[in-house]
Amino acid sequence: MDTIRPRKFEFAVLVAIIGILAVGLMSALDRVRESFEEAAVQSEAAAIRVELLDWLAHREIIGGKLPESRNPIRWIAQQPENYLGELDGAPKERGVWYFDSRRQELVYRFRFEREARFRLVRGAEAASVPGSFVGVGLRRIEVVSKTVK
């Protein structure tokens, strides 16, 4: 009987240690998942910028006027796979792109309570945007870290 009690205690300590390690591992995996999602957003934004540059270079050679729309997705041929369209407010879905028609911004809603916002800029404002061409560029405005419902 005396040997059973220490074994139960050792087992309880082992379970507690494994539980603490599991919680630490889960939080580390969440941070990695957030980093991967941020990298995917940056990659998609870069692809949109490249398509904008391609479209603008084509327009510069052929001529014609620029679209009036402030939605960069309307300027390009290939929209992001998870693009919901032009909306007046934030959608319920997460991990999606949409154009906020009130703020005139392209938005990505992260799965982890954040948003990345981009704005199509023109004229003198575009001069400070990396990758701008003929006075047009896509600028990352902010990453909003808040609870968005």
Regions found by a protein language model. Give the residues of each.
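Short, surface-exposed interaction loops/tails
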Residues: 105-149
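Structured, soluble extracytoplasmic/luminal domains of envelope-associated proteins
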Residues: 83-121
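Membrane-proximal N-terminal amphipathic helix
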Residues: 36-61
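Short, glycine/small-hydrophobic-rich surface segments
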Residues: 52-86
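Short, intrinsically disordered/low-complexity patches at protein termini
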Residues: 5-7, 61-62, 131
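N-terminal single-pass transmembrane signal-anchor helix
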Residues: 1-33
